[in-house]
């Protein structure tokens, strides 16, 4: 199935829930199993995203119960009362899983910034399995497009010094969103590119405040998986796109060797947007890994 078809399939099944996690109202969506498996898969989205960004992958995981929260300050979830750093997000994830009784029984998936949140959580607690999609496995400023990352960093730091209204307009600017989307998308399929751009225009500005956007950005470049891989004892699947702009494929291969128990799957002709460009393939690999780690 195509990405838009998988997304539609998931949205038809999704049930909205709210829970108080880390003292704030948090929203998550549950996609019931078709009855063929009792396993639970939890998907954690990336920076400036929300649960909708991973629905195409969720649509390919129909045999499982799937949970997709909006991280604090993004989507429909309220922002935290303190700083939105990586430790706060990992603590929130831990409390989320405990509250839902899924801390010891779930397979936890993280994409991009979500891989850092899941990785830090997994370095402290074990899960049935951990799946990292295009994990941030090297310092952000040393990736294939380090120059663009430096410009982006300056962009977010500038936003902090501007009046709230202007900073909000700047960060949510459709032009800025389209530049990012155009750089990240690797597919040559025009229809898919248009769909990807629409997803970003609809969802990439879904953050609660300039404070959240700036603090979470700092969190996204504060560390990388190479610094915590050796602490993650759960079985790990790394789904790495060969054309990823954030972490090169060779770095993904090298860092994978430092996990106690990791498997790497490489996706050719795909970039950072695996969840849009190859969600069906990602779901197939996730399903196979879940089945081998029940």
Predicted feature residues:
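Conserved alpha/beta-hydrolase catalytic His-Asp/Glu region
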Residues: 166-230
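Conserved HGGG/HGGXW glycine-rich cap/lid loop of the alpha/beta-hydrolase fold
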Residues: 24-78
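Active-site loop/oxyanion-hole signature of alpha/beta-hydrolase fold enzymes
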Residues: 24, 68-113, 143, 284
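Conserved alpha/beta-hydrolase "nucleophile elbow" surrounding the catalytic nucleophile
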Residues: 45-47, 110-112, 241
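Catalytic active-site module of serine/aspartate enzymes centered on a nucleophile-bearing elbow/loop
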Residues: 260-294
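Short beta-strand/loop motif that positions the catalytic acidic residue
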Residues: 232, 238-240, 244
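Flexible "cap/lid" loop of the alpha/beta hydrolase fold
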Residues: 130-164
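Conserved alpha/beta-hydrolase "acid-adjacent" motif
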Residues: 245-251
């Amino acid at each position: 199935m195509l990405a838009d078809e998988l997304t539609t399939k998931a949205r038809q099944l999704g049930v909205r829930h709210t829970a108080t996690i880390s003292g704030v109202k948090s929203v998550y969506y549950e996609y019931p199993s078709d009855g063929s498996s009792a396993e639970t898969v939890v998907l954690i989205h990336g920076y400036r995203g929300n649960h909708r960004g991973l629905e195409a992958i969720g649509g390919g995981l129909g045999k499982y119960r799937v949970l997709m929260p909006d991280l604090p300050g993004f989507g429909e979830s309220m922002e935290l009362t303190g700083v939105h750093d990586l430790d706060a997000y990992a603590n929130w994830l831990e409390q989320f899983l405990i509250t839902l009784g899924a801390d010891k029984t779930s397979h936890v998936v993280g994409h991009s910034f979500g891989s850092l949140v899941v990785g830090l959580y997994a370095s402290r607690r074990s899960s049935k399995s951990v799946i990292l999609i295009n994990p941030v496995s090297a310092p952000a400023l040393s990736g294939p497009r380090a120059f663009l990352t430096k410009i982006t960093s300056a962009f977010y730091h500038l936003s902090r010094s501007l009046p709230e209204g202007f900073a909000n307009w700047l960060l949510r600017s459709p032009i800025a969103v389209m530049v990012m989307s155009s750089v990240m998308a690797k597919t040559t399929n025009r229809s898919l590119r248009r769909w990807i751009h629409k997803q970003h225009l609809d969802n990439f500005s879904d953050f609660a405040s300039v404070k959240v956007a700036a603090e979470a950005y700092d969190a996204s470049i504060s560390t990388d998986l190479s610094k915590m891989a050796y602490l993650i004892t759960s079985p790990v699947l790394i789904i790495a796109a060969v054309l990823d702009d954030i972490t090169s494929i060779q770095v993904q291969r090298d860092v994978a060797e430092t996990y106690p128990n990791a498997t790497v799957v490489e996706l050719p002709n795909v970039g950072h947007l695996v969840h849009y460009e190859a969600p069906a393939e990602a779901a197939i690999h996730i399903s196979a890994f879940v089945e081998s780690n029940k």
